[in-house]
């Protein structure tokens, strides 16, 4: 019974963590979200873009006595840039997403077992006498439950990151519409620039998550060792610590991605 519980906990955790890679590259809802954005958000974004352009015209008119033809040309060019940006924003975001997906696909996790296998622990438990097995029941249940919860939390974070990407795709026309605001002062509008960095950070987040999983897959085998003094209880605690450390790294990966891109 204890052997089945431990095996199930390890297998479930390893499978969940491996499945996170599939979740992070899932774009099945992309087209639906884009279509919804075009019908709901795009008209609002066009209105905002026009208001921003009119505001820029008024600000320019206040600074000069007459609006020269050069200023008119700049306004028309700016209007064209905003219009093209609104039209091409899904393709820009898709290109950023595809780059991250390509990187994630290169980090194959199908054969990655962050906790390794439970054979050594099971062999140790099978060698225990019945009283010792009965005493070990509660610790085994608690630690196995903790391992599974840690795996589910990692999968939850992966789905959360996917929803974050899709929400950004849905609202994308709104921050792009502010591109014209302040453009006469040079550079990209702060709202637009912030949005692009946040979206890129969300894409990078998935890649960093997979890097964390790969790193732990490489080093976890040296962490959990049934031969270390303390017996099966210490070994199970080591396994739980590995799962929780992995969870902590995955949680922290979001802030790492944002700090890299200053988002």
Language model features with spans:
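Alpha-helical transmembrane segments and their helix-start/interface "positive-inside/aromatic belt" motifs
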Residues: 65-89, 192-202, 257
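Binding/recognition "hotspot" determinant
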Residues: 1-49
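Alpha-helical transmembrane segments
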Residues: 177-197, 229, 259-261
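Hydrophobic transmembrane alpha-helix segments characteristic of membrane transport
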Residues: 48-80, 171-187
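Alpha-helical membrane-interface segments at transmembrane helix boundaries
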Residues: 33-42, 77, 93, 126-129, ...
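Short, well-ordered alpha-helical packing segments
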Residues: 45, 58, 73, 77, ...
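Hydrophobic alpha-helical transmembrane segments
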Residues: 42-54, 142-149
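Non-cytosolic segments of integral membrane proteins
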Residues: 81-173, 202, 206-262
């Amino acid at each position: 019974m204890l052997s089945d519980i431990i095996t199930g906990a390890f297998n479930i955790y390893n499978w969940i963590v491996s499945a996170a890679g599939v979740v992070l590259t899932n774009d099945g809802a992309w087209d639906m979200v884009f279509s919804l954005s075009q019908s709901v958000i795009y008209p609002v974004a066009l209105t905002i873009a026009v208001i921003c352009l009119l505001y820029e015209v008024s600000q320019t008119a206040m600074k000069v006595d007459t609006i020269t033809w050069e200023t008119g040309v700049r306004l028309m060019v700016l209007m064209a840039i905003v219009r093209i940006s609104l039209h091409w924003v899904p393709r820009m975001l898709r290109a950023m997403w595809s780059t991250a997906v390509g990187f994630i696909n290169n980090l194959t996790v199908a054969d990655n077992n962050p906790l390794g296998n439970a054979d050594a622990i099971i062999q140790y438990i099978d060698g225990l006498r019945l009283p010792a097995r009965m005493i070990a029941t509660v610790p085994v249940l608690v630690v196995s439950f903790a391992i599974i919860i840690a795996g589910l939390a990692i999968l939850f974070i992966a789905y959360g990151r996917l929803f974050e990407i899709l929400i950004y795709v849905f609202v994308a026309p709104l921050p792009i519409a502010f591109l014209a605001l302040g453009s006469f002062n040079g550079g990209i509008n702060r709202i637009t620039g912030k949005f692009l960095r946040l979206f890129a950070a969300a894409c990078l987040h998935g890649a960093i998550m997979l890097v964390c999983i790969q790193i732990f897959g490489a080093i976890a085998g040296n962490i959990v060792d049934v031969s270390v003094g303390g017996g099966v209880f210490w070994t199970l605690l080591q396994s739980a610590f590995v799962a929780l450390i992995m969870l902590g790294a995955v949680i922290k990966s979001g802030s790492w991605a944002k700090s890299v891109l200053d988002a």
